[in-house]
Amino acid sequence: IKSVLRQDYDNWELIIVDDCSSSYEQLQKFVEDLNDPRVVYTHNAINSGACAVRNQAIMQAKGQYLTGIDDDDEWTPNRLSIFLSHKAQLVTHAFLYANDYVCQGEVYSQPASLPLYPKSPYSRRLFYKRNIIGNQVFTWAWRFKECLFDTELKAAQDYDIFLRMVVEYGCLLYT
């Protein structure tokens, strides 16, 4: 949450969907104490699962573009501004994606010892073999709203929606 608040681009909306966690009151108070109208909190009384929660947030979103962040993720301070500087590419690309980094304190790095860093540049052949993206992309909100995550899948839900987007809207772009 704090990494979203630190973005160098200010016009965003953060939708937090708490899927029936035992510590929801603590999170709810944290969000209330932020007193930031850009941060929207929703608590589910019944656990509905990751795909349903992502779909719930997607459908709540009011913005023109959409990207995601999971509770164990952190964004670099310029994540949104970098994606937005490449938004014209969405005319011919299904979505944009970027490298993962490891954060230690305030230092972001790409350690060579971790096999998933850096991510591979897009190639259709490689993409059809495995998920080279990870779990978060940036694209127009309407694309997410048309595709949505498949709540019936038990694994690879992110890869599934990305494949469907590529088939429907064109290749993807690594930024």
Task: Give the residues covered by each predicted segment.
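Short alpha-helix within the catalytic core of nucleotide-sugar-dependent glycosyltransferases
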Residues: 1-2, 26-28, 55, 63, ...
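Acidic donor-binding segment of Leloir-type glycosyltransferases
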Residues: 3-43
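Glycine-rich, basic loop-to-helix element that forms the pyrophosphate-binding segment
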Residues: 44-61
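Short aromatic/hydrophobic "clamp" motif used to bind/position activated sugar donors
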Residues: 66
